């Protein structure tokens, strides 16, 4: 079984390669790691592979899928939860097996969201830089106590639930908005409509998937309904936020702070070193000049535990496909490695 991994970083090689070596899979897996992202220009590098492993910024449009199919690839494995970058209907038509890693260490993302909140709130990033320059003045570093504040969680899935469990420990009141409420979350907070959440919360944290109904869920209209001076945190998907809208809200002081681990235009920038380049994304560069904005490079998931779970689940998905065993992680069941057609589109 030959697997080609696109957009491979050193940590992908360490975790995927290490776990593949140590696990007993049948048939044995031969992995080819490529640092280049998958696109129409690089799809030919998968020639001879049974499967490809891709990441959130790889391109899997109809043209790329057809090139992969012509190269002999029959399975596509996402080593992430998001799959907005693939044409699933074309993948189904061609008979691909497609699977993702739906959840990995939700606590990692929730913990990072809280870290962003406290960095922004208590201004530890500014204090760190001051002290390095010998400046121990506290002016401009005033924060607020989280205890007693109201935190709104948009999306109460596994990450949203983990967020609720952590924030409850600070003594915060919790509100949530989700079209699909869960009994598990009701132990920690109250479900309300989005307008109520925005108007009452001191902190709003986004933990919902990106789809048509959530694209730019934060926009001119919804920002105008937020409590004045509230903090907005996004560790989910960049497309949830209309960046122009939050920029205006920051300038008018409607928003008191913004913490982003994801960004709508991140594909051209994130996971790469641009320290020696001129960055042409004027919107992002403008955001980073605000004293009340913190931006990180999509690292909320980035823990040892999460990388282990991702590697194990990715290889388990491959093993299930190779053995013709249905997997709950399939986005498209396609054909198994023996060419037998399984049921079509699993979910969209």
UniProtKB/Swiss-Prot annotation:
NAD(+) binds at residues 158-159, 178, 208-209, 235-237, 261. The keyword NAD applies. CDD domains: LDH_like_2 (cd12183). Induction: Expression is positively regulated by the KK-1 cluster-specific transcription factor kk1F. The keyword NAD applies. Gene3D superfamilies: NAD(P)-binding Rossmann-like Domain (3.40.50.720). Pathway: Secondary metabolite biosynthesis. GO terms for biological process: antibiotic biosynthetic process. Its EC number is 1.1.1.-. Keywords: Antibiotic biosynthesis, NAD, Oxidoreductase. Disruption phenotype: Abolishes completely the production of KK-1. D-lactate dehydrogenase; part of the gene cluster that mediates the biosynthesis of KK-1, a novel cyclic depsipeptide with 10 residues which is a promising active compound with high activity against many plant pathogens, especially Botrytis cinerea. Within the pathway, kk1H catalyzes in the synthesis of D-lactic acid from pyruvic acid, which is recognized by the A domain of the first kk1B module. Belongs to the D-isomer specific 2-hydroxyacid dehydrogenase family. This is D-lactate dehydrogenase kk1H. It comes from Curvularia clavata.
């Amino acid at each position: 079984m030959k697997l080609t991994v696109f957009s491979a970083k050193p940590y992908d090689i360490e975790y995927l390669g290490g776990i593949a070596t140590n696990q007993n899979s049948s048939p044995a897996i031969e992995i080819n790691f490529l640092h280049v992202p998958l696109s129409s220009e690089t799809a030919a590098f998968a020639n001879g592979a049974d499967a490809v492993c891709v990441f959130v910024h790889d391109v899997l449009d109809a043209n790329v899928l057809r090139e992969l199919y012509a190269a002999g690839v029959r399975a596509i494995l996402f080593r992430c939860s998001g799959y907005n970058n693939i044409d699933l209907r074309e993948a189904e038509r061609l008979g691909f097996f497609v699977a993702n890693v739906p959840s990995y260490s939700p606590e990692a993302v929730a913990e990072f969201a809280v870290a962003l909140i406290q960095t922004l709130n208590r201004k530890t990033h500014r204090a760190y830089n001051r002290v390095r320059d010998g400046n121990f003045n506290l002016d401009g570093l005033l924060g607020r106590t989280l205890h007693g504040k109201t935190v709104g969680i948009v999306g109460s899935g596994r990450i949203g639930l983990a967020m609720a469990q952590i924030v409850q420990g600070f003594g915060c009141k919790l509100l949530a908005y989700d079209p699909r409420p869960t009994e598990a979350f009701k132990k920690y907070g109250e479900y309300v409509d989005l307008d109520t959440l925005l108007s009452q919360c001191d902190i709003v944290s986004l933990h919902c998937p990106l789809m048509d109904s959530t694209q730019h869920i934060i926009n001119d209209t919804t920002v105008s309904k937020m409590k004045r001076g509230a903090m907005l945190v996004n560790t989910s998907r960049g497309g949830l936020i209309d960046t122009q809208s939050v920029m205006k809200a920051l300038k008018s002081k409607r928003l008191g702070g913004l913490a982003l681990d994801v960004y709508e235009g991140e594909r051209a920038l994130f996971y790469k070193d641009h320290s020696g380049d001129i960055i042409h994304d004027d919107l992002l560069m403008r955001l980073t000049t605000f004293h009340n904005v913190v931006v990180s490079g999509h690292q909320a998931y980035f823990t040892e535990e999460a990388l282990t779970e991702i590697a194990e689940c990715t290889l388990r998905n491959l093993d299930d496909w190779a053995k013709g065993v249905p997997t709950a992680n399939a986005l498209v069941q396609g054909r198994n490695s023996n060419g037998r057609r399984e049921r079509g589109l699993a979910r969209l």
